[in-house]
């Protein structure tokens, strides 16, 4: 996968050189480049200006963004604008982006964008109902969530399949050594070696956690008969 990021602050992306994203680069599975679009700005390197019609703040000008993207060698990229008014980013969205060969991210600052910039983009993405100082943190989040889904990036292909949201449910509780820590013990079922009992326990705990913390996810979840019965059992036990 090739990723190009348009930003005024390339140095903010240093953390991406480490961990999973860094390993993807080392394996030759990811090629990532940062472009300071101030370098392409005309008018004394100014990238922002006052909005026509008046109003608060400054807007990102179209010219630096257009010129930066036009010099990027890309065949058919997904061009992503980070915007609080965009489509909410989800695990399913990350899975979709992980199938692409080329992604371009536009990280804004200031009050907003000249609307004409949006004629370039294929996706407008938001991390949620809040506003950040710039798009860099959002871009890093999306890149991390997406790159880890590229085949061969993680040690095992199944490593991400049990993640929260990958199945549509929150992930079940997990434990490691020691068995007893300060009086808190590992559930006996996980020590039993009985694979079917462990599977059922994990499924029930995933359903319980999702029901208690994110019931909205269950509204669009496609239940199996087994899952429906387990959820009914959970609801009855909780009263």
Swiss-Prot record:
Listed GO biological process terms: tRNA N1-guanine methylation
Keywords: Cytoplasm, Methyltransferase, S-adenosyl-L-methionine, Transferase, tRNA processing
SUPFAM superfamilies xrefs: alpha/beta knot
GO cellular component: cytosol
Key word Cell membrane present: no
Predominant localisation class: cytoplasm
Catalytic activity: guanosine(37) in tRNA + S-adenosyl-L-methionine = N(1)-methylguanosine(37) in tRNA + S-adenosyl-L-homocysteine + H(+)
Enzyme class: transferase
UniProt entry tagged with the keyword tRNA processing: yes
Molecular function via GO: tRNA (guanine(37)-N1)-methyltransferase activity
Gene3D superfamilies xrefs: 3.40.1280.10, tRNA(m1g37)methyltransferase, domain 2 (1.10.1270.20)
Binding site for S-adenosyl-L-methionine: 108, 127-132
Subcellular location: Cytoplasm
EC number assigned by the record: 2.1.1.228
Function in brief: Specifically methylates guanosine-37 in various tRNAs.
UniProt similarity note: Belongs to the RNA methyltransferase TrmD family.
Subunit field text: Homodimer.
Protein name: tRNA (guanine-N(1)-)-methyltransferase
Species in which this protein is naturally found: Streptococcus pyogenes serotype M4 (strain MGAS10750)
Lineage: Bacteria, Bacillati, Bacillota, Bacilli, Lactobacillales
